[in-house]
């Protein structure tokens, strides 16, 4: 049985002091959480130092929102994997739609980051994929998403998939209040799992974690998580307040 991975993505919110305070509330709130649920928080780079002091030694994993595929050098504004590991980062989000849109990241760059991440001792790498509203309306959802999966995992060995989490995040549902119906999400998640089976094996497909991201909240999370191929959520706005994030966690772990 696959575990449920609930990751809060705090994006560009909170000072380091504010982030540490929210993280402390979450850590305290999940002290006795069901072992089948994995809780993750992803603050800004500038908050990692303070938040890691809160999450260290707890059952809450600490993540980063991006990283460079280079380990050092003339990469102004970027951050290296070793720098993240210094702050106890457990996982990194790669290929988020906002990075694709605002930072110009493409599949080739994202794949380089995946391959670099696998060379470092992160517990997990979250590879995000998803289609725009225009692509969905043209009936291209599966073509776009599965192509991103293939490109993102290029040259990744099956033995490394245990450290890869896939996150389907329809771009049109991120921060808009719109959410794919559980049936729409399940259709894509099932297709992704079948693609993993085609690329690797049935065992790999059965075991890989596939999160859903896109305006997840306490009202829709239970329905989404009830689908066969949805194994967790990458949560934005509803993870910014400890009480709303804890309500989501408690609803799934009850």
Curated annotation (Swiss-Prot):
GO cellular component: cytosol
Pathway membership: Carbohydrate biosynthesis; gluconeogenesis; Carbohydrate degradation; glycolysis; D-glyceraldehyde 3-phosphate from glycerone phosphate: step 1/1
Major location category of this protein: cytoplasm
Keywords from the UniProt entry: Cytoplasm, Gluconeogenesis, Glycolysis, Isomerase
EC id: 5.3.1.1
Highest taxon of the lineage: Bacteria
Enzyme class: isomerase
Catalytic activity: D-glyceraldehyde 3-phosphate = dihydroxyacetone phosphate
Subcellular location: Cytoplasm
Isomerase in keyword set: yes
Active site: 96 (electrophile), 169 (proton acceptor)
Matching InterPro entries: Aldolase_TIM, TIM_sf, TrioseP_Isoase_bac/euk, Triosephosphate_isomerase, Triosephosphate_isomerase_AS
GO MF terms, alphabetically ordered: triose-phosphate isomerase activity
Binding of substrate, residues: 9-11, 175, 215, 236-237
Pfam families, per database record: TIM
Subunit field text: Homodimer.
Family, per entry: Belongs to the triosephosphate isomerase family.
Function in brief: Involved in the gluconeogenesis. Catalyzes stereospecifically the conversion of dihydroxyacetone phosphate (DHAP) to D-glyceraldehyde-3-phosphate (G3P).
NCBIfam families in alphabetical order: tim (TIGR00419)
Protein name: Triosephosphate isomerase
Organism: Borrelia recurrentis (strain A1)
